[in-house]
Amino acid sequence: MDVMTLATIPSPPQGVWYLGPIPIRAYAMCIIAGIIVAIWLTRKRYAARGGNPEIVLDAAIVAVPAGIIGGRIYHVITDNQKYFCDTCNPVDAFKITNGGLGIWGAVILGGLAVAVFFRYKKLPLAPFADAVAPAVILAQGIGRLGNWFNQELYGAETTVPWALEIYYRVDENGKFAPVTGTSTGEVMATVHPTFLYELLWNLLIFALLMWADKRFKLGHGRVFALYVAGYTLGRFWIEQMRVDEATLIGGIRINTIVSAVVFAGAIIVFFLLKKGRETPEEVDPTFAASVAADAVASPDGKPLPKAGEGIDGETPSTR
């Protein structure tokens, strides 16, 4: 065994465990963990902007199932050759636990669901979008760990020290099962861990969004526009490294084209949107009024923080 082999990144021996007859899938656990973290962070950020944090959980109940459905639909459409061919089983298109979610489908359908929800609540969408943007990119990073367990979304073979080992996995009958099987210990190939590249990129964009939001006091949807631009920039170059089967348009992977188009659109939208940040009264006037009333009625005589105070050490008057 040489030094390069010692330096490679091992894949997990399996991505599915069983609790009796119930399968526990690492891919699903990573998605759930990402959702939980996103809800927690969004509650803090939305409350700091002056919104009612309880709205976040309500929005998540609407957005999460819509996002998962949208993500799966986008994946099946853009990777239809995996489900609709002479040797394919179309029923596999519904087996979401085997992996396969397209982020753009999740953002579009999940975003539409949230937009309808906020319209029903008669609240502006932009402050929530800005609050949720860093949380979404962080959740995406956590979710990418699921690709590691599934041994999917990797790049070309390589001998770099951080190459990922892809194991030969088999099911209980000894048949090849790269996603649901258990490793035999045989290394089929060492490849570029593109899932890891995207995970690290997502964490970088998360940090940049948090910094930019604090430094420039962004609002009116500009944080969300930056999230879209940042993610698509990374997805554009990472997509070039992937070798998994994908739909091509003019010899170019469809997600490469989508990333380029969406990146350009996000940059344009960012500069068109209004500068500055909304006041708590603009974010949720009813909640802001109730917080102000509670502050006046504080039993110990000490005024409570107003809605929106605390974000980046600001008060409404300094925005």
Curated annotation (Swiss-Prot):
Sorted alphabetically, the Gene Ontology cellular component annotations on this record are: plasma membrane
User: GO MF terms on file?
Assistant: phosphatidylglycerol-prolipoprotein diacylglyceryl transferase activity
The membrane topology of this protein is:
Multi-pass membrane protein
Q: Where does a 1,2-diacyl-sn-glycero-3-phospho-(1'-sn-glycerol) bind?
A: R144
Q: What class of enzyme is it?
A: transferase
Where found in the cell?
Cell membrane
Keywords of the record: Cell membrane, Membrane, Transferase, Transmembrane, Transmembrane helix
For the biological process aspect of GO, one term held by this record is: lipoprotein biosynthetic process
Q: What is its EC number?
A: 2.5.1.145
* Pathway in which this enzyme or protein is active: Protein modification; lipoprotein biosynthesis (diacylglyceryl transfer)
TM segments?
Answer: 21-41, 50-70, 98-118, 191-211, 254-274
The UniProt annotation puts the region (Disordered) at: 295-319
Highest rank taxon of the organism: Bacteria
Q: Which HAMAP family match?
A: Lgt
Q: Which family does it belong to?
A: Belongs to the Lgt family.
Function statement: Catalyzes the transfer of the diacylglyceryl group from phosphatidylglycerol to the sulfhydryl group of the N-terminal cysteine of a prolipoprotein, the first step in the formation of mature lipoproteins.
Protein name as annotated? Phosphatidylglycerol--prolipoprotein diacylglyceryl transferase
Organism equals Corynebacterium glutamicum (strain R)
Q: Which gene name belongs to this protein?
A: lgt
